[in-house]
Curated annotation (Swiss-Prot):
Chemical reaction(s) catalysed: uridine(55) in tRNA = pseudouridine(55) in tRNA
Coiled-coil annotated residue ranges, if any: none
HAMAP family reported in the protein's UniProt record: TruB_bact
GO MF annotations, alphabetized: RNA binding; tRNA pseudouridine(55) synthase activity
Full protein name: tRNA pseudouridine synthase B
Source organism of the structure: Shewanella sp. (strain W3-18-1)
EC number: 5.4.99.25
Amino acid sequence: MARRPKGRFIDGIVLLDKSTGMSSNFALQRVKRFFNANKAGHTGALDPLATGMLPVCLGEATKFSQHLLDADKRYLVTAKLGERTDTSDSDGEVVQTRPVTFTEAQLLSALEHFRGDTQQVPSMYSALKYQGQPLYKYAREGIEVPRESRPITVFELNFISLEGDELTLDIHCSKGTYIRTIIDDLGEMLGCGAHVIMLRRTQVAQYPYAKMVTLEQLEALVTQAHEQQIDPSVLLDPLLLPMDTAVADFPEVNVPEASAAYLMQGQAVRVTGLKADTLVRITLGDAHRFVGIGAMNDDGLLAPKRLIVIHDEPIVTD
């Protein structure tokens, strides 16, 4: 007989405001424990130094976390000019010090170089793997391995301020963009070196900044629930966003309840008006209940790709 997973069935997304100094996995496990969720996963790690938006998917929402991994991100970053470190951030050792002598015109010209579609060579201090091992493990042993450049897009790069030797930028970029690498490359282009001293992720996809919560806020709600002798879920669950927000940019296909049984068994159903290979959000009936994602095939049929398991316990919806 299959063993029931520990924790309760709860499906939704927490917009965690990660604090500095902790790993993304540590933050994930804390959220999972606060919600007593049977399953949890994050949607793109932040360095321990970094703070800000870390969407945590609970329960069936984990099936759609890849779509948030692929989403655009936005960051506020402050760089210290005149010093280059081995990790390109303040957690590393200073390896070179140079005077800061560039002009404002040179700075603005250098920033223009990073806008749009470019190629980026990932830092050795990254979680990308080479022969099964994360690059940072090689770096810590003083070993440099070959890395191929990867295409990235910087949609916006806004100059915020330059105060003394500290430069602050706002960067809206595609998935897989390493902000530390942008800062290191910028420092070399300016001839003075630079490294990240503050990094805050302010946006993932279209999630609102104002919806973020900290671990301290979650812990306070759990404490409050215990003091009031109520289940913590009463105070915590209203913070969850519906899991279909992870695929909010997909067009919706509403399927009649009569077709639900076919879909939930993995069978394709006929839908008109959409091109082949279009990924869609599937909802059922007049309530537009989200049940997963699918794709249109060449025959005009909607084939389910990722469907949720519907439990007796509540699913977070609008």
